[in-house]
């Protein structure tokens, strides 16, 4: 039982001096002067309770920290357009960054490929829970996003190889071609 907190309830309401009862990791009641019962009590006077935060652009698990080559799988930089790769296949659930994010209140994370490619692949939305596999972290029913980057990263990565795109106009030309190819594929 968390007592005397300033609570933001996720609907825009602020509740001062509020109580929040949590059972088995889920909020089961909220209000003021809730009965304690057999619950452990935490005095949260001067502290805030908020819904879990959602990180909509993260590279946790695909660029693990501390970084070593074996866990740096965020960019498939073999072609400027790698729409067929999925970030979830590179997620390392033991990345210590997940625990750090959770300690800061981040409970849901969209993991995206890096920005080295024009079209870097599909992202995945995960629940930030301790797990041994990314499948155990997947957020049920979450939509997938497609990572696209238009700017410094693709033109730097490929320009340094004397390959297109090496300019922003090359970036946009690459998008046009990728979209035309996708239309033809349909």
Predicted segments with their positions:
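Solvent-exposed loop/turn segments at secondary-structure junctions
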Residues: 27-28, 48-49, 58-61, 115-117, ...
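Sec/Tat-exported extracytoplasmic proteins
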Residues: 9-11, 24, 31, 53, ...
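Active-site gating loops and adjacent loop-to-helix segments of metal-dependent hydrolytic enzymes
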Residues: 66-91, 129-132, 147-149, 154-157, ...
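Polyanionic/metal-chelating signatures
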Residues: 97, 102-186
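Histidine-rich, glycine-flanked metal-binding segment
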Residues: 7, 11-50, 67
């Amino acid at each position: 039982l968390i007592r005397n907190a300033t609570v933001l309830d996720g609907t825009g309401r602020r509740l001062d001096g509020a109580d929040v009862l949590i059972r088995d990791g889920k909020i089961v009641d909220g209000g003021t002067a809730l009965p304690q019962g057999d619950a452990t009590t935490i005095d949260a006077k001067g502290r805030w309770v908020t819904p879990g935060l959602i990180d909509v652009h993260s590279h946790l698990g695909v660029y693990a920290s501390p970084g070593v080559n074996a866990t740096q799988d965020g960019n498939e930089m073999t072609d400027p357009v790698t729409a067929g790769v999925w970030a979830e296949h590179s997620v390392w659930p033991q990345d210590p960054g997940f625990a750090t994010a959770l300690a800061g209140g981040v409970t849901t994370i969209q993991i995206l490929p890096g920005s080295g490619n024009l079209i870097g692949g599909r992202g995945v939305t995960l629940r930030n829970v301790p797990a041994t596999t990314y499948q155990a972290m997947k957020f049920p029913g979450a939509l997938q996003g497609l990572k696209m980057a238009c700017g410094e990263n693709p033109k730097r990565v490929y320009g340094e190889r004397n390959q297109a795109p090496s300019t922003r106009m090359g970036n946009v030309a690459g998008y046009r071609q990728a979209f035309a190819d996708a239309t033809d594929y349909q």
